[in-house]
């Protein structure tokens, strides 16, 4: 029996179709080669390089905790609820924190500048020995318009969602958290938020100036 194979005519007819499929595949491969890196880059860029100042803290717009905390250098204690009716700046700091040392002059300057405006500044010692915190203030200086308090067992820090320092929160006259700075504060940043709040406007809710520092292991 004679085996019948494909005719030369049918083979020739299949060649253009095969070439069309090959060209189509190459064209789509070229498109994907261009699109995929852009898409992946955009995805990772959105996740890794997005501006954290545009991401609001979930605490913004929420009432601040009313926990009572003891003063660092004097007898007695205070609660943030004692300061209702005033704009309040709450700064979490520690003597072992490098960025806290960097921002300290700016906080002191802001406390002095906004004293007549009735702004209260609270410095909350975070996971630090009182003696070390006092030594820090002896070296770096204190502001008269500042209340320095301790935070036993970090309960106030937990209420504010603090896991490292420095972090600074701004409370409006109703005791609501209006804004937050993560990382070292600067005088322009502090003034920008306070000027907006004192004028009755909504400040930038969340600004990130750098990483925070966790407490060292003892």
Where are each of the predicted segments found?
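N-terminal targeting signals for export/organelle localization
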Residues: 1-66, 210-218
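A short beta-strand-turn-helix
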Residues: 67-88
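Active-site acidic short loop of glycosyltransferases
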Residues: 84-85, 116, 143, 162
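Hydrophobic beta-strand anchors of alpha/beta hydrolase catalytic cores
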Residues: 89-90, 121
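Aromatic-flanked redox-active Cys/Sec active sites in thiol-based oxidoreductases
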Residues: 91-97, 126
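C-type cytochrome heme c attachment motif
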Residues: 95-102, 167
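Structural microenvironment flanking redox-active thiols in thiol-disulfide oxidoreductases
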Residues: 101-141, 151-159, 209-218
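Thiol/disulfide oxidoreductase modules built on the thioredoxin-like
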Residues: 138-144, 150-201, 205-218
